[in-house]
Amino acid sequence: MLSGSIVALLTPFKADGEVDFDGLQKLVEYHIAAGTNGIVAVGTTGESSTLTVEEHVKVVNKTVEFVNGRIPVIAGTGANATHESVTFSRLLNDSGIDACLSVTPYYNKPTQEGLFQHYKAIAEVSNVPQILYNVPGRTAVDLLPEPVARLAELENIVALKDATGDLNRVAIHRELCGEDFILLSGDDATGLDFVKLGGQGVISVTNNIAAKDMADMFRLALEGRFEEAEVINQRLMPLHKNLFIESSPIPVKWAATQLGLIECGHLRLPLTELSEKCHPIVAQAMTDAGIY
């Protein structure tokens, strides 16, 4: 169910800062037409930290409605307070989502045992599969392989999104967690190599603006056609790198606006729009990738 190129979907806003649900539906249709293998709603790229609880739940519910069972929908449910992640999980239990993606608690820097207990508490209240999400560059805490292996023994913890960029961990996680545990890259620049080493796919920022290329690349990779996949990967590499020239999702939201995928590139503070000096860099990356 969870494999291939999964998009970490943008949340489009109107100029007044309200969520643009018509724009959200347009994005969903773009991804389904392009062959995207799944959608993460209200993750980091979806600006989860600046949405209210009500907005968060509504964006997930609307995404499920718009997708209408055509591809899996994964809901972001991460927070740095366990009770908040538990609340999101309970609120979304009957939403029709296919899985939840929960980032490690950020800022408060829990121990490895604290991380284990955090995810265990979420798993105990959720009736949908759970995806662990490790991105120490944003959270200041690293979920190590040993607690991942303990968590993988729990019935509804089925996957890990690994955004460390440490490719050595693919084999470590596979050995510790078993063949049935799903490993997804959270780093576009190393995503293809991640699959070459035994991962099942990527949760991608680049996918927001190069959906067909990403879907094709990971389809080829999962078929073992790595040389063909690498040709696409090298063409997209300027995007993989320059979509992080400022904090994501700032660059990708600007790029999506330039491509007409969303009407407004508004972000909620403290995120601000892409610096003007970065416009030509991101535009050139899109040109080099053949999408602009």
Curated annotation (Swiss-Prot):
PROSITE patterns reported for this sequence: DHDPS_1, DHDPS_2
GO cellular component: cytosol
Pathway(s) this gene product operates in, as recorded in its UniProt entry: Amino-acid biosynthesis; L-lysine biosynthesis via DAP pathway; (S)-tetrahydrodipicolinate from L-aspartate: step 3/4
Catalyzed reaction equations: L-aspartate 4-semialdehyde + pyruvate = (2S,4S)-4-hydroxy-2,3,4,5-tetrahydrodipicolinate + H2O + H(+)
BP GO terms, sorted: diaminopimelate biosynthetic process; lysine biosynthetic process via diaminopimelate
Keyword Cell wall biogenesis/degradation: no
Subunit structure: Homotetramer; dimer of dimers.
Listed name of the protein: 4-hydroxy-tetrahydrodipicolinate synthase
Gene that this polypeptide is encoded by: dapA
